[in-house]
Amino acid sequence: MSELECPGLPASWLNAWLAAVGITALVPEMRLSWTDGPAPQGLLATSDGRDPVRALTSAWPSPERIAEMPIAEQLHGCEDIVPNLPLRTFRERAERFRGHDDSWSISSTYTDLHVDETQPGVVLAARSRFAPPAPGPVGPIHRRLTRVFGFVDEPFAQITATLEGGARRVNANGLGFDISRVTTLADDSDKSVDPVLEVLAFFGLSLLPIRGAGTRRTAQSRSAYLAARQRLWFLDSDDGRRHRLMWPAWSHSLGRNGIDALLDAWSPLNRGTWRRLGVHAGWRSVEYRWQGNDPTRGIGSEAL
């Protein structure tokens, strides 16, 4: 297999980890593992011997695919997608696009297995933590994806730069959860992201569906035990009141289905399972603490 080490995909950086997983979602022949040592980096290999960069360039999504995704903000014949999504709108999209290749874009963003009834007269589908609300023109997650996708006009060159760790950043908010776009509280400069990484990270979400236990969130019931939970979000053992994202690095070269199986089997708080699965490192989320009315969100990491 043709193998490529990617300094631009450090496993400790959540968006880079998601991007690496997203590559396997876009390229069925792609295999992913992580280097050993204190700072694991992505290792990409193709089962058919193709150069990983050229294979990914060939599979880069078209503008039509992005525009016609089931999660698209506006689609003919459907109610518009808004950040606080009415349950009826979610169900309309889920039913219409059942079996669609990108139906995961709905199930990794919203769920009807936990609903929000905290606002009188409206029932909302639970929303992923990866689709944080954003004010004004930033809009819902598909609008953010579309904007950042538009910055990728030379896929081969830009993919190469991203994997090498030398990508040129652009002034954009990206998907809205990359901690590296946040500087300091005193810095009100424009946020910047790597557009290739953000697009790939979105496809990485295809392996992280959001689910629930058929419960309701009301003004009287807000328990973390009953909340919707996305794959890899675990109840925090430190306080038992919030969920934290936890993700692994592994040594075996795995395709999308293999990664899917590993994420099902991995128990981050039971280190006895790590070696059996080839997992040699893991991280948990540390979220940006905003102040006042600051709408900024971001997810960083600390080693498990």
Give the label of every model feature segment.
Residues 168-170, 187, 240:
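A generic structural signal for short, non-catalytic loop/turn and secondary-structure boundary residues
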Residues 164-178:
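Active-site-adjacent bridging/hinge elements
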Residues 1-161, 177, 181-182, 201, ...:
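Conserved small-residue
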Residues 2-11, 21, 163, 189-192, ...:
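Elongated scaffolding segments in large macromolecular assemblies
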Residues 158-159, 175-176, 225-229:
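Short amphipathic alpha-helical surface micro-motifs
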Residues 177-193:
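Amphipathic interfacial helices
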